[in-house]
From Swiss-Prot:
Organism of origin: Escherichia coli (strain K12)
BP terms from Gene Ontology: response to hypochlorite
PANTHER family per the UniProt record, alphabetical: MERCURIC REDUCTASE, PYRIDINE NUCLEOTIDE-DISULFIDE OXIDOREDUCTASE RCLA-RELATED
Induction comment from the UniProt entry of this chain: Induced by RclR in response to hypochlorous acid (HOCl).
Keywords annotated in UniProt: Disulfide bond, FAD, Flavoprotein, NADP, Oxidoreductase, Redox-active center, Stress response
NCBIfam families assigned: chlor_oxi_RclA, PRK07251.1
The name this protein goes by in its record: Probable pyridine nucleotide-disulfide oxidoreductase RclA
Cofactor note: Binds 1 FAD per subunit.
Known role: Probably involved in reactive chlorine species (RCS) stress resistance.
Length: 441
């Protein structure tokens, strides 16, 4: 049996970064990845990087086939780079195969050339998440039905794309494919569009999408899916929709089943997420879990922060924990992007805080005029007692950069006036924060 000080399951952001750090510290490390098409993890291969590459090219009205080619070039470059960053290092063995726990120190790696058993003093799980496939008759057998990975590898642009699910993944793909020229229909089972956002923000997003030609159908309870005359037929309670391709955008769930974590005494919750404490320990003393597999926020930057927590315990002072995370921002890369940090207005009011809410139309921002995209709105919530920001929603071009400025001021516990009076370059989208916070009375 091959023995290692550290065995890392999954080539994601946390796993690959931890592997390099431990190898540099002199540890003997094995990193197990089930697919050689996934070196670098979800983000590089089937998530952030390919989707945002296509979002960019769609905004430039690049031909779809050429955009797919460029996406593949970007992904292949980064995948190869990530592989060699690890495989070429002393002390690291990259092992291709499907890992399965035998016990809390031993793993069986299933490989075409024969199974391999390895021993790890410490084991780290970073296997990510996978698409949730709802139990709709025909969804797994009908040609033309894709998860996000499959849709990223289409050979030609669908004339009409249906999207099953109106959450953030669905919105991002809807905007992208509408920009490429597809007709897009979102089918959302809920009665409310983007329920985690304030209604004014969600309504703005819906307006932007509809102006792009996207149809949004709420209360769409799909009963079955079939195939007829080279189209996907989506049958719901009151209507039938024919599309050229259908995207399953019903969310993602932790990828743990094939690991058989129970063999190692690792507890999982009802969604299959690995149960961890604030330092990412599982219920097995020598095993940690990082990233999407823990069932938390599914962002690459959270996986990276998970790595920092584990690194600090193994090689540092052991003081870092998930409790240190303050305000986690996120962006939805529709056109223009939505970015948010902190509370919504609804959450702030429910908290009982005495608040002010200010909004600024993007049409009032000079830089937005220069860039010829005046769609959207900026919104901020300020605590009247502390003068601190409780949250912000930015629906505008470049919001994915601006939100990080807001986050840093919030994390530092500084008053909103820091942004009101900050000196920004001109003309820039960031300087609109001067105007937004000047509206606070």
């Amino acid at each position: 049996m091959n023995k290692y000080q550290a065995v890392i399951i999954g080539f994601g952001k946390a796993g690959k970064t931890l592997a390099v750090t431990l190898a540099k510290a002199g540890w003997r490390v094995a990193l197990i990845e089930q697919s050689n098409a996934m070196y670098g993890g979800t983000c590089i291969n089937i998530g952030c990087i390919p989707t945002k590459t296509l979002v960019h090219d769609a905004q430039q009205h690049t031909d779809f086939v050429r955009a797919i080619q460029r996406k593949n070039e970007v992904v292949n470059f980064l995948r190869n780079k990530n592989f060699h960053n690890l495989a070429d290092m002393p002390n690291i063995d990259v092992i291709d195969g499907q890992a399965e726990f035998i016990n809390n120190h031993s793993l069986r790696v299933h490989r075409p050339e024969g199974n391999l058993e390895i021993h790890g003093e410490k084991i780290f799980i970073n296997t990510g998440a996978q698409t949730v496939v709802p139990p709709i008759p025909g969804i797994t057998t009908t040609p033309g039905v894709y998860d996000s990975t499959g849709l990223l590898n289409l050979k030609e642009l669908p004339g009409h794309l249906g999207i099953l699910g109106g959450g953030y993944i669905g919105v991002e793909f809807a905007s992208m494919f509408a920009n490429f020229g597809s007709k897009v229909t979102i089918l959302e089972a809920a009665s409310l569009f983007l329920p985690r956002e304030d209604r004014d923000i969600a309504d703005n997003i819906a307006t932007i999408l509809r102006d792009q030609g996207v149809d949004i159908i709420l209360n769409a309870h799909v009963e079955r899916i079939s195939h007829h005359e080279n189209q996907v037929q989506v049958h719901s309670e009151h209507a039938q929709l024919a599309v050229d391709a259908l995207l399953i955008a019903s969310g993602r769930q932790p990828a743990t089943a094939s690991l058989h974590p129970e063999n190692a005494g690792i507890a999982v919750n009802e969604r299959g997420a690995i149960v961890v404490d604030k330092r990412l320990h599982t219920t097995a003393d020598n095993i940690w879990a990082m990233g999407d597999v823990t069932g938390g926020l599914q962002f690459t930057y959270i996986s990276l922060d998970d790595y920092r927590i584990v690194r600090d315990e193994l090689l540092g002072e052991g003081k870092r924990s998930t409790d240190d995370r303050k305000n986690v921002p996120y962006s939805v890369f529709m056109t223009p992007p939505l970015s948010r940090v902190g509370m919504t207005e609804e959450q702030a009011r429910e908290s009982g805080a005495d608040i002010q809410v200010v909004t600024l139309p993007v049409a009032a921002i000079p830089r937005a005029r220069v860039m010829n995209d005046t769609r959207g709105v900026l919104k901020a919530i300020v605590d009247n007692k502390t003068q601190r920001m409780l949250g912000a929603s930015l629906l505008c071009v470049d919001s994915h950069e601006m939100i990080n400025i807001v986050k840093m001021v919030m994390d530092a516990g500084l008053p909103y006036s820091i942004l009101r009076d900050q000196i920004f370059t001109h003309p820039s989208m960031s300087e609109s924060l001067n105007d937004l916070f000047s509206l606070v009375k």
